[in-house]
Amino acid sequence: MAQHLLHGTLHATIYEVDALHGGGVRQGFLGKILANVEETIGVGKGETQLYATIDLQKARVGRTRKIKNEPKNPKWYESFHIYCAHLASDIIFTVKDDNPIGATLIGRAYIPVDQVINGEEVDQWVEILDNDRNPIQGGSKIHVKLQYFHVEEDRNWNMGIKSAKFPGVPYTFFSQRQGCKVSLYQDAHIPDNFVPRIPLAGGKNYEPQRCWEDIFDAISNAKHLIYITGWSVYAEIALVRDSRRPKPGGDVTIGELLKKKASEGVRVLLLVWDDRTSVDVLKKDGLMATHDEETENFFRGSDVHCILCPRNPDDGGSIVQSLQISTMFTHHQKIVVVDSEMPSRGGSEMRRIVSFVGGIDLCDGRYDTPFHSLFRTLDTVHHDDFHQPNFTGAAITKGGPREPWHDIHSRLEGPIAWDVMYNFEQRWSKQGGKDILVKLRDLSDIIITPSPVMFQEDHDVWNVQLFRSIDGGAAAGFPESPEAAAEAGLVSGKDNIIDRSIQDAYIHAIRRAKDFIYVENQYFLGSSFAWAADGITPEDINALHLIPKELSLKIVSKIEKGEKFRVYVVVPMWPEGLPESGSVQAILDWQRRTMEMMYKDVIQALRAQGLEEDPRNYLTFFCLGNREVKKDGEYEPAEKPDPDTDYMRAQEARRFMIYVHTKMMIVDDEYIIIGSANINQRSMDGARDSEIAMGGYQPHHLSHRQPARGQIHGFRMSLWYEHLGMLDETFLDPSSLECIEKVNRISDKYWDFYSSESLEHDLPGHLLRYPIGVASEGDITELPGFEFFPDTKARILGTKSDYLPPILTT
């Protein structure tokens, strides 16, 4: 049957199944083994646990809760609001019986996409069929209702944010908040000599903010509470390191600062991810070197409450799923919540809540500036914070290059800050143990209730919304029933309740976009349902989030209308780690497949319009790198790296990637998302890694009638100044052909400088073309002469792993 593109929203309801007879049949040898295992360990006998799923072709897009002990007539009555961007011939409803090891297939019902594509409501009983498409015993049927809304029926499609009345992303746990203030941070620190002149509306110039200085001040000035969550928190790092900007008390480590505040009576609570691999004797640092046990030991016996927090599964999953979640997934939110003085109320005792959200963990290797030096800070700010996990045996005693760190963070003030605190309270209540959260009700005469910090008339005011990827295994207070969950903007699964609003926020922002999108992210992979079956079975990958496909479909829709639209994506050269290792190569392989899927969409759309244009004028990928000539008086290491290693080659060539750890998207210079979530399935799933993000805009700086010139525009221009080493008039309009051609041209030139044999000057900027080619049909190819990243034997296009399960690397 012909496949149709379903791009929009599918409203689906699964009511009930009538007249089921007997269980389903397990297939083949494995089925017999599972039956024997169940009999031996005494599980899976007796009760039925029936649930239903919705698939668009082979992509799972919804699932009901389990109904226990209703073997004949299970009634779910569950409704789903499904974002779709899938080619499909059928919408498939599958009924299964769950058990601790896996699930038994009862049967499947099919509704052809032809029936829903025109938008009419379909409400019918559909026959349930077996694997051979014959009716199952007893002729059972499932009652479902479907209605499809094409993306162009959405009144926000292609419109951007039309006015200050824009209500935010619908169907989410947290509503959009008005009257907020946001500070945007590029990198952990900005030195005084980073001063791009970027004009904003109202005759102002953009002023960069300093993240770790502000966090230091916020912690230092807290009087009642300091709440911190992190993937990693390392007690031994210093937040203040710029000798030209000293602060009173700034020479302490964050661990000592938190102990001091706790001893003064401030409630200091830390939730740090418990890396389950870190107990393994063979992995003294854990796979990811998070220092979780060192941090716990540092605070033991002090007034600081530090909880190591495993990523526990929500209750009720199969044994296999539970093992996957607790050993493979992480707590990834990076937040700081403090009480703070009231702005401009001299002498007032009243306090408010201020929160920080973004990509920067308070740990080693994160302190950096937009200059991202490889060698020149090794005797100063990075001497005791030398981070280089991409080479075996790298150490300060052997010298650079260190791994520079590019990241983005935000400070939130106003009602939105309380939402971040509520997220912490939900997580602490679930996994923190003792009930020692500060009872704000008892402090109501000191800490104000959530209230605006700015009037809506103020030209600097923000509207902000909080988004998460999290489930009931990590947050308390989620409703039990699917109806209540849907009401609260949550998604109900087979055995868990999920907040997946970060993915929703990205989808919404992409669909609204008018002119351009600028993405910086540590990972870029997904929409595996649309990947080519080149050596893989796409439905086995399960990296099902929509973001890459939504981006390519947005470009396609603009090409079809003859309108301009550009997408710029910055990723790291490779994911942190040994670049030739199996996991890094597997992720690069998924990234290549994602890029290829997108470029094929773009090229097909151009061909359909009779255009033979360079697809990089619509969609373009970059990475960041630095290269420095040797200067007199530079740090001289006592030892050398081993000969003929990546480390030695990089040291001799004086170059290395700048690690892009950011998780940010800017749309039309008017809307920004900043958080902890990567563009991969782990971060976007909701039931894998736990994440948090903000999405916001300034209602007085929309790109409705003229280009937006508020803080978001200033922030993007400041980032481009950091990456390109220059400002240019063409950068003011990223949607123009002149702009994308110029940025591509500069990044091509910088890649040539970066990868050349000899080096006469420092690299003039950091933005490098991502070193791939795009063939005439959209296939991703090697750039001539670049099978491997410079100084390595690691393939740029990646290598499919035959032993690592996709759930680990997607």
Curated annotation (Swiss-Prot):
Induction: Up-regulated by abscisic acid and ethylene. Up-regulated by salt, dehydration and osmotic stresses. Not regulated by abscisic acid. Highly expressed in roots, stems and flowers, moderately in leaves, seedlings and siliques. Not detected in seeds. A 1,2-diacyl-sn-glycero-3-phosphate binds at residues 332, 522, 661. It catalyses: a 1,2-diacyl-sn-glycero-3-phosphocholine + H2O = a 1,2-diacyl-sn-glycero-3-phosphate + choline + H(+). Residues 327-366, 656-683 form the PLD phosphodiesterase domain. Optimum pH is 4.5 to 5.0 in the presence of micromolar levels of Ca(2+) and PIP2. Optimum pH is 5.5 to 6.5 in the presence of millimolar levels of Ca(2+). Keywords: Abscisic acid signaling pathway, Calcium, Cell membrane, Cytoplasm, Cytoplasmic vesicle, Endoplasmic reticulum, Ethylene signaling pathway, Hydrolase, Lipid degradation, Lipid metabolism, Membrane, Metal-binding, Microsome, Mitochondrion, Repeat, Vacuole. Ca(2+) binds at residues 187, 372, 406, 722. The active site is at 332, 334, 339, 661, 663, 668. Changing residue 565 to A: Decreased GPA1 binding. Ca(2+) requirement for activity depends on pH. Active either under acidic conditions with micromolar levels of calcium (PIP2-dependent) or at neutral pH with millimolar levels of calcium (PIP2-independent). GO terms for cellular component: chloroplast; clathrin-coated vesicle; cytosol; endoplasmic reticulum; membrane; mitochondrial membrane; mitochondrion; nucleus. Residues 1-126 form the C2 domain. It is a peripheral membrane protein. One of its GO terms (biological process) is positive regulation of abscisic acid-activated signaling pathway. Not inhibited by neomycin. Disruption phenotype: No visible phenotype under normal growth conditions, but improved resistance of the seeds to deterioration during storage. Insensitivity to abscisic acid for both promotion of stomatal closure and inhibition of stomatal opening. Hypersensitivity to hyperosmotic stress. Increased NaCl-induced disorganization of microtubules. No effect on abscisic acid-induced stomatal closure. Pldalpha1 and plddelta double mutants have a suppressed abscisic acid-induced stomatal closure. It comes from the Eukaryota. Changing residue 564 to A: Loss of GPA1 binding. Its EC number is 3.1.4.4. It is found in: Cytoplasm; Cell membrane; Mitochondrion membrane; Microsome membrane. Belongs to the phospholipase D family. C2-PLD subfamily. This is Phospholipase D alpha 1. It comes from Arabidopsis thaliana.
